[in-house]
Structures are given as structure tokens and as C-alpha cells.
């Protein structure tokens, strides 16, 4: 009799532990500390930025010596296929880092809002728009 009671209690305890262990944890994604990215047009916002600061006077123009080429007709493909962006972890994108840290352009750091434009464009998936 004692053995039957003990076995019954063990089965009940086992079922209880297993049913609690089957709880479905819902993991919600963390909120982005930067907030939602603003809309950035590659052709309307970034190409003018590149024209003003990057692809003039022998820097990131059509020549292969200073890749990537940032002339309007080649810029998107050069950036995307050259590995300069990372849409999974946008703030680790090379294009963003060199502008944000001030290492490019060599004539002086761009205003912070220009680095933010690049980051937001990458955060939006780096569309060719």
C-alpha cells in the first residue's frame, strides 16, 4: 500500500514538473535605442552627400585606387557588393564607421547628421531608391 501511494505521488510530481516545464516563453524583441530609422533616399540624400564630400578631386571617383567608387552611376553597387554595409548589424557597417569616426573624408569629419543619414539608410535595409 505504501509503495502504491509513493509511486502515485511520484507520478503526480513528475507530471506537475513536466507541465510547468512546458510553459511557452514569449521573447519579444528589444526596443531600438535609436528609435525607428528615418526615411533616407539613396539617390536624393546620399548621392548629393557623396558628390559634395567623397567623389571629387581623385578620391572615390571612378578609379579603382580608392574603392569604393562613389560616382552616382556606380555608388550603390560598389557599396553593397563591396561589403561596406551590414544590414543585420547596421552600426557595424564600414561605410557608417568611417564617416561616424571622422576617418573619412580626410578633409575633416562630416556633421553628425550625415553619419545618421547613412546609418538610417542601412537600418532601412539599404534600398536602391
Where do the language-model regions lie?
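Aromatic- and Gly/Pro-enriched helix-to-coil junctions and flexible linker segments
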Residues: 21-129
Amino acid at each position: 500500500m505504501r509503495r502504491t501511494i509513493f509511486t502515485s505521488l511520484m507520478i503526480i510530481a513528475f507530471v506537475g514538473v513536466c507541465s510547468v516545464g512546458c510553459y511557452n516563453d514569449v521573447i519579444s524583441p528589444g526596443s531600438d535605442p535609436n528609435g525607428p530609422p528615418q526615411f533616407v533616399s539613396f539617390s536624393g540624400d546620399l548621392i548629393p552627400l557623396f558628390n559634395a564630400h567623397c567623389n571629387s578631386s581623385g578620391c572615390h571617383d571612378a578609379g579603382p585606387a580608392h574603392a569604393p567608387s562613389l560616382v552616382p552611376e556606380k555608388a550603390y553597387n560598389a557599396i553593397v557588393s563591396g561589403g561596406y554595409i551590414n544590414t543585420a548589424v547596421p552600426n557595424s557597417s564600414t561605410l557608417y564607421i568611417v564617416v561616424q569616426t571622422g576617418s573619412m573624408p580626410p578633409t575633416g569629419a562630416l556633421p553628425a547628421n550625415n553619419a545618421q543619414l547613412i546609418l538610417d539608410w542601412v537600418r532601412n535595409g539599404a534600398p536602391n531608391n
